[in-house]
A protein has these predicted regions:
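Modules that initiate DNA replication and primer synthesis
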Residues: 5-8, 17-20, 34-51, 56, ...
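Short, well-ordered loop/turn elements at secondary-structure boundaries
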Residues: 21-23, 32-35, 82-84
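Short beta-strand
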Residues: 26-33, 68-72
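A structural signal for short, well-ordered beta-strand segments and their strand-loop junctions
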Residues: 27-31, 39-41, 88
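Flexible helix-coil linker/hinge segments at domain or subdomain boundaries
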Residues: 59-98, 117-129
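Short, surface-exposed amphipathic charged segments that create phosphate/polyanion-binding patches used
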Residues: 85-87, 103-106
Length: 170
């Protein structure tokens, strides 16, 4: 799965710091347009609906609650010809790409080569059950009847400029 953050300019290093602070296993890549694609990798098959719920919680905690979440569909009907939506993958035209992973090496942020990206995938792959129980915005059972983005906002606080919208959503 992935999050697509279209914010320009975007400080990829701060984004990585926040994800590490939240202990979210993922890889941040620069997108074609300079935003970020945050990729999540799993050791086993994962239900798309479950992924989307947790990804919404993570995106809210990052302050990007309106970013796109991939997969966009919770299910597709193959017999009807559905194929789902796509996201541009990193390392297109890998010799001179603008779409690369950003990793921390020896305390510094670096543009990862394709082989380093593949190595990083092995490090961040997680089990779906571990991903779903990440305590992003506090205890997993906090306010279970609220939508994920509101649970996160109520647990970690409302970002500047979001007070009125959050109050209206409540």
């Amino acid at each position: 799965g992935a999050l697509d953050i279209d914010e320009y300019p975007l400080d990829h290093n701060k984004l990585i710091d926040k994800l590490e602070e939240l202990k979210v296993p993922c890889i941040v890549c620069r997108s074609k347009s300079g935003g970020a694609h945050i990729f999540f990798f799993f050791k086993e098959w994962m239900n798309a609906g479950d992924f989307r719920d947790k990804a919404a919680e993570i995106s809210s905690a990052l302050g990007h609650g309106r970013c796109e979440i991939f997969p966009k569909q919770e299910q597709i009907l193959v017999e009807r010809g559905d194929v789902g939506n796509f996201i541009n993958l990193p390392y297109f035209d890998s010799e001179q790409t603008l779409r690369y992973a950003i990793i921390r090496r020896e305390g510094a942020y670096v543009e990862a080569s394709l082989s380093e990206f593949i190595e990083e995938i092995q490090k961040v792959k997680t089990l779906p059950k571990d991903f779903l129980t990440l305590p992003i915005g506090g205890p997993v059972d906090l306010l279970p009847n609220y939508i994920p983005c509101l649970r996160t906002k109520l647990a970690i606080g409302v970002f500047e400029g979001e007070r009125n919208r959050t109050a209206f959503q409540l």
